[in-house]
Amino acid sequence: MFLKLFFIIFFNTIFLSNLYAHHPGNKIEAKIPYPIINIKVSRDKIEGYNLFFDLQNFKLSPENIEIRNKNNSGYLQLFINDIKISRIYSSWFHAPERFFSQKENSIKIKLFTNFHDELTIDNQPIEFEFKVLK
């Protein structure tokens, strides 16, 4: 009996934790005027890099996460060297030096709605990518 109960709890825990692990949302077409992302990167005097996200036609709205979608609003996802680092809910982010392990490092930003749906233009993800050289 104990072994049966253990397996039921174990497999349900594994299944349920993986069910929501990656928020595999849909793709949603952005509304016109389309969002534009400009990113400014500056070396931090102590360690790492400071990123500033200048967004046009897109509103960061952490107060609405998992509540409702509004046109061209939500959050950003930050990838460094193709590794998801964080969700971004404000215009500024400090990226520690440990994420910049290569001579040429790739930074990518993608836009998502409050329900974790990827924003697109003509079914292509809205993203901005550039390189940071050490």
Task: List where the protein language model places each region.
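Short beta-strand elements bearing conserved aromatic residues within extracellular beta-rich modules
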Residues: L76-L78
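Short, compositionally biased P/S/T/A/G/V-rich stretches that sit at domain boundaries
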Residues: A21-D44
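Exposed aromatic-hydrophobic patches
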Residues: F93-F99
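Short, well-structured beta-strand segments within conserved domains
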Residues: Y49-F53, S101-N114
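Contiguous beta-strand segments within globular domains
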Residues: R43-N57
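Short beta-strand segments within Ig-like beta-sandwich modules, predominantly Fibronectin type-III
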Residues: K84-S91
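Short acidic/polar inter-strand loop motif in beta-rich domains
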Residues: S86, F112-I121
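Short amphipathic, basic-aromatic surface patches that mediate peripheral association
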Residues: D54-R68
